[in-house]
Amino acid sequence: MESPIRFENVDINTILKTLPHRFPFLLIDRVRNIREDYSGIGVKNVTFNEPAFQGHFPDRPVFPGVLMIEGMAQTAGVIGIMSVSGTEKPRAVYFLTIDKCKFRKPVLPGDTVEYHMKSIGRRKTMWWFHGDAVVDGKTVAEADVGAMLTD
């Protein structure tokens, strides 16, 4: 059984208040279904106008895998920050680790990537998440990411 939803939809304005990232490095458009088990889904609408497509690759644009991993990390950051309440609320998230990373299928302009993130561990200010990047119901990438929430 899934845990209850704490935040149903985190829009771009809330993300901008939560994360320090800005264009061209803010790589999520919204986060939905943040649950009490520290899971949630980040959403990235990939368009041909992405700056990375100027060089990756001009004649056959493919969304870079490293940017999907960063999108996973940003989604995890929003989940972590919004899940901590009161005076413990962190002001920054530092991306620390990437493990078990696999890229399975290219992501192209017009795709919507969903970053399905779930906490797999927490110790003090350290958090670990497993993430699956999903397009049209198919996993295109996966990784375990670690981060430190701090003030």
From Swiss-Prot:
SUPFAM superfamilies: Thioesterase/thiol ester dehydrase-isomerase
Gene Ontology cellular component list: cytoplasm; membrane
GO molecular function terms noted in the UniProt entry: (3R)-hydroxyacyl-[acyl-carrier-protein] dehydratase activity
Similarity section: Belongs to the thioester dehydratase family. FabZ subfamily.
Catalytic activity: a (3R)-hydroxyacyl-[ACP] = a (2E)-enoyl-[ACP] + H2O
Protein name listed in UniProt: 3-hydroxyacyl-[acyl-carrier-protein] dehydratase FabZ
EC number: 4.2.1.59
Role, per record: Involved in unsaturated fatty acids biosynthesis. Catalyzes the dehydration of short chain beta-hydroxyacyl-ACPs and long chain saturated and unsaturated beta-hydroxyacyl-ACPs.
